């Protein structure tokens, strides 16, 4: 007769199941709330561009997987690129626009369960639900159930975020993928053998909006700090002599920091760009030139001034 496993007790299992259901229920409520709220929101200027091009992107992918056409530079350029800086909205990656188009084709044209505009906007709403679920489960792991519910509700009840999540645009999806990348990076610091999730999610964030290029700077600072702390602890545990010369100590510290969780760095550096490349057909032909054109467009983009709380902000970066 074996001793009972307390972690596998029926009560414990029911508790875990209940906590999971709470998280998924909060995500579902978020999607419903966003989908209901967006019905009273008019079409934003950018949405019209993303909807039009997203429908064409979706048709191209469907034609590809149904063998209606092959992969050629001509078909990719005609759908995703062109000689002009804004031809076929090539200045923005294709991921979310493609999802907008696929959603409209499935939910509106095929199933007929939502209006055309709602169907285009549904991927953003679903993404916001995913964000609430991710926040819930991360906080649940770190602090507990009450804190997780509070954190998820605070995200759900952000008015501006709910507004953006109801648009067929990139702002809400990129927020979700930023958080997902950070969460995957944090989990990768546990020393797992291959933290591929961080790289793939960062690649999807890049394929959503160019602002994801800033994410490694924030993660890099954090990695440097935790790596230095870990290196210092390891040195103390080994009772190493502090008599080494400063250059030797600096070199040892650099090796320790880089090697602390090096697989996370490799995941971001390799899988991130690779994922971006795979989901954006415009990069399949002449990728170096097209990436340069993509970045050049945004580094020299016209500045939009705006008024906030009675003040007119005219100078970048505001």
Regions found by a protein language model. Give the residues of each.
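Transmembrane-helix signature of polytopic, membrane-embedded enzymes
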Residues: 19-20, 24, 114-115, 135-157, ...
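Short acidic/glycine- and proline-prone juxtamembrane loop motifs at membrane-interface regions
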Residues: 44, 163-173
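Membrane-interface transmembrane helices that cradle and orient dolichyl/undecaprenyl
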Residues: 142, 181-196, 205, 227
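Short helix- or helix-capping micro-motifs
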Residues: 151-156, 183, 202, 206, ...
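Transmembrane-embedded, aromatic-rich helix segments that form part
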Residues: 196-198, 211-230
């Amino acid at each position: 007769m074996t001793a009972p496993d307390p972690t596998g007790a029926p009560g414990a299992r029911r508790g875990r199941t209940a906590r999971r259901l709470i998280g998924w229920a909060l995500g579902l409520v978020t999607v419903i709330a966003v989908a209901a709220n967006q019905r009273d929101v008019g079409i934003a200027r950018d949405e019209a561009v993303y909807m039009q091009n997203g429908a064409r992107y979706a048709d191209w992918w469907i034609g590809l997987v149904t063998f209606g056409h092959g992969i050629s530079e001509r078909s990719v350029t005609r759908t995703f690129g062109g000689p002009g800086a804004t031809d076929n909205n090539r200045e923005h990656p294709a991921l979310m626009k493609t999802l907008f188009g696929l959603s409209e084709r499935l939910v509106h044209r095929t199933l007929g369960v939502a209006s055309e505009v709602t169907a285009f906007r549904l991927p953003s709403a679903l993404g916001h639900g995913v964000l609430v679920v991710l926040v819930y489960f991360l906080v649940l792991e770190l602090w507990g159930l009450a804190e997780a519910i509070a954190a998820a509700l605070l995200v759900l009840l952000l008015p501006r975020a709910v507004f953006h999540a109801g648009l067929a645009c990139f702002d809400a999806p990129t927020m979700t993928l930023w958080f997902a990348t950070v969460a995957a990076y944090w989990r990768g610091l546990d020393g797992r053998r291959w933290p591929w999730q961080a790289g793939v999610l960062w690649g999807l964030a890049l394929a959503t909006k160019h602002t994801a290029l800033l994410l490694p700077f924030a993660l890099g600072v954090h990695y440097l700090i935790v790596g230095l702390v870990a290196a210092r602890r390891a040195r103390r545990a080994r009772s190493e002599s502090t008599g080494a010369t400063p250059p030797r100590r600096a070199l040892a510290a650099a090796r320790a920091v880089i090697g602390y969780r090096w697989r996370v760095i490799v995941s971001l550096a390799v899988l991130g760009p690779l994922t971006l490349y795979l989901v954006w057909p415009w990069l399949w032909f002449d990728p170096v030139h097209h990436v340069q054109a993509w970045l050049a467009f945004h580094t020299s983009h016209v500045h939009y001034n705006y008024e906030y709380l009675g003040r007119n902000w005219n100078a970048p970066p505001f």
